[in-house]
C-alpha cells in the first residue's frame, strides 16, 4: 500500500490563455480534468490516500474532488500561501500523511500510463530512498538527463546539454521513502529536482530510476494539452453524459465535449476541447479552440485557435 501527493499548485504560465480562469490541473483532457486522470491512475496502483498540494486558484479543487469517496479513496488538501517549489510543496503536504508507507509524488501536468504499482515494487525491492520514473526520448537535448548504472541506480542529474550522455529523462513521478521527505526543510522554497535529488546522489544515497516506455506526455502547453486529449480519445470525438448533438453536426479531429452540452444543427467542430454545460448554436464553425465551461457560442460564430469563455475571447498559440 502507499499514499500520494499531487503537485497541483503551479500557475500554468506556459498554458496561457487556457489558465486565465482555471488552474492547469483542472483543464479537461478527454472530458476529465488532468488531475482526475491522475487520481484514477493512483487508485489503480492501490494508493488509498492522496493530498492535493494546491496554491493557484486552490478553491476550485475541493468542490470537485471532495473527500475522494467518489473514487474510493481519501483526498486531503494542503494549501500553500506562497509557492514553495516542488520540495517545499511535498514537505508541506506530507504533514497530513503518516510515515509508515511509501509516498508517490505526481507532477500536476503529466499524463502517463506507466505502472505505478510496479514503480513502487521496484522502489521497495531496492530499499531506495527515492525512485524516479524515467523514460527514454529520441532527443534529450531539450531536457535534463538522468544516467543510471546497470542496476538502475542514478549516477547523476545533468542539466540540458548539446550532447547528452543518455536519452533517459525524468518523467515526473517519484516514490519517496517517508523519512527522506522529513529531511526536506519545512516552510522553505526547495526544488527536489535541482537540490534534493542531486544532494542525495552526491551523498551516495540509494536513488533509483524505474524505466518504463509506456505512454507519457507533459501537457504543459496548449499544443500538448490538445494532443493529450486527442491521444486519449483515439477517434473523431468523445462526448460526456447528458450532451445532445444535432444529427447533421460534423465533429472530427479527436474533439472532446464535456457533459450536458448542446451542439446545434450544422455545427462544424474540429480538434477542439469543449467544457461542460456549453451551448453551441446552429452553423457555428470551431477549429483548434478551447471552449470553457458554461460558454454560449452564438449561431454562425467562426473561431480558429481561440480560447472562448463567458468573459474572454483570446488567441491560442498552437
Residue positions per predicted region:
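A short, conserved acidic/glycine-rich loop-to-beta-strand motif
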Residues: 126-136
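Short internal beta-strands
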Residues: 51-55, 133-134, 290
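Catalytic-core segments of class I nucleotidyltransferases/pyrophosphorylases
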Residues: 102-104, 111, 117-124, 137-140, ...
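Conserved N-terminal catalytic core of the sugar/cofactor nucleotidyltransferase
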Residues: 2-6, 28, 32-107, 116-118, ...
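Mobile, glycine- and charge-enriched loop segments
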Residues: 1-28
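Active-site metal-binding loops of divalent metal-dependent hydrolases
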Residues: 11, 108-110
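A structural signal for short hydrophobic beta-strand segments in well-ordered beta-sheet cores
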Residues: 26, 146-148, 197, 209
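A structural motif detector for beta-strand N-caps
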Residues: 237-250, 255, 261-263, 267, ...
Amino acid at each position: 500500500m502507499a499514499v500520494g501527493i499531487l503537485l497541483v499548485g503551479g500557475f500554468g504560465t506556459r498554458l496561457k490563455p487556457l489558465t486565465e480562469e482555471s488552474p492547469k490541473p483542472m483543464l479537461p483532457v478527454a472530458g476529465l480534468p488532468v488531475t482526475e486522470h491522475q487520481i484514477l491512475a493512483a487508485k489503480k496502483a492501490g494508493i488509498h490516500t492522496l493530498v492535493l498540494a494546491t496554491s493557484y486558484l486552490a478553491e476550485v479543487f475541493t468542490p470537485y474532488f471532495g473527500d475522494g469517496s467518489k473514487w474510493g479513496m481519501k483526498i486531503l488538501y494542503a494549501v500553500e500561501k506562497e509557492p514553495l517549489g516542488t520540495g517545499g510543496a511535498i514537505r508541506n503536504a506530507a504533514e497530513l500523511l503518516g510515515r509508515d508507507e511509501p509516498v508517490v509524488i505526481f507532477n500536476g501536468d503529466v499524463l502517463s500510463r506507466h505502472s505505478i504499482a510496479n514503480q513502487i515494487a521496484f522502489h521497495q525491492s531496492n530499499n531506495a530512498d527515492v525512485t524516479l520514473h524515467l523514460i527514454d526520448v529520441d532527443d534529450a537535448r531539450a531536457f535534463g538527463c538522468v544516467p543510471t548504472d546497470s542496476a538502475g541506480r542514478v549516477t547523476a542529474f545533468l542539466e540540458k546539454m548539446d550532447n547528452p550522455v543518455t536519452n533517459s529523462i525524468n518523467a515526473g513521478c517519484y516514490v519517496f521513502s517517508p523519512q527522506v521527505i522529513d529531511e526536506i526543510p519545512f516552510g522553505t522554497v526547495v526544488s527536489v529536482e535541482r537540490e534534493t535529488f542531486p544532494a542525495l546522489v552526491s551523498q551516495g544515497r540509494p536513488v533509483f530510476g524505474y524505466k518504463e516506455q509506456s505512454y507519457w506526455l507533459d501537457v504543459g502547453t496548449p499544443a500538448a494539452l490538445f494532443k493529450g486529449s486527442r491521444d486519449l480519445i483515439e477517434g473523431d470525438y468523445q462526448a460526456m453524459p447528458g450532451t445532445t448533438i444535432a444529427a447533421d453536426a460534423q465533429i472530427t479531429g479527436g474533439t472532446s465535449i464535456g457533459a450536458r452540452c448542446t451542439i446545434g444543427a450544422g455545427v462544424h467542430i474540429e480538434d477542439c476541447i469543449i467544457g461542460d454545460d456549453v451551448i453551441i448554436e446552429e452553423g457555428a464553425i470551431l477549429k483548434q479552440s478551447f471552449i470553457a465551461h458554461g460558454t454560449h457560442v452564438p449561431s454562425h460564430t467562426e473561431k480558429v485557435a481561440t480560447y472562448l469563455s463567458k468573459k474572454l475571447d483570446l488567441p491560442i498559440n498552437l
